[in-house]
């Protein structure tokens, strides 16, 4: 499987059986910049703390960097 990996947001090969993930959360600059985003791959979908959004998927490049809605 190929997943996008931060910080470069490049597509990289991950080991067989891994899943891609997109993790998003707010930091002190959330109001100005939007949520922080972490892209990667893991053996299983990571467990996250409250307030952190995680999406996992298992097809090539299924975790692109989310686009921010313009108002």
From Swiss-Prot:
PROSITE patterns: SNAKE_TOXIN. Signal peptide: none annotated. Disulfide bonds join 3-20, 14-41, 26-30, 45-56, 57-62. Expressed by the venom gland. Keywords: Acetylcholine receptor inhibiting toxin, Disulfide bond, Ion channel impairing toxin, Neurotoxin, Postsynaptic neurotoxin, Secreted, Toxin. It comes from the Eukaryota. One of its GO terms (cellular component) is extracellular region. GO terms for molecular function: acetylcholine receptor inhibitor activity; ion channel regulator activity; toxin activity. It is found in: Secreted. SUPFAM superfamilies: Snake toxin-like. Belongs to the three-finger toxin family. Long-chain subfamily. Type II alpha-neurotoxin sub-subfamily. Binds with high affinity to muscular (alpha-1/CHRNA1) and neuronal (alpha-7/CHRNA7) nicotinic acetylcholine receptor (nAChR) and inhibits acetylcholine from binding to the receptor, thereby impairing neuromuscular and neuronal transmission. This is Long neurotoxin 1. It comes from Naja haje haje (Egyptian cobra). The lineage of its organism: Eukaryota, Metazoa, Chordata, Craniata, Vertebrata.
């Amino acid at each position: 499987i190929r997943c996008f990996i931060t910080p470069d947001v490049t597509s990289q090969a991950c080991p067989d059986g891994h899943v891609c993930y997109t993790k998003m959360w707010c930091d002190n600059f959330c109001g100005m910049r939007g949520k922080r985003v972490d892209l990667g791959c893991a053996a299983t979908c990571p467990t996250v703390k409250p307030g952190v959004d995680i999406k996992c998927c298992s097809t090539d490049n299924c975790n692109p960097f989310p686009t921010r809605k313009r108002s």
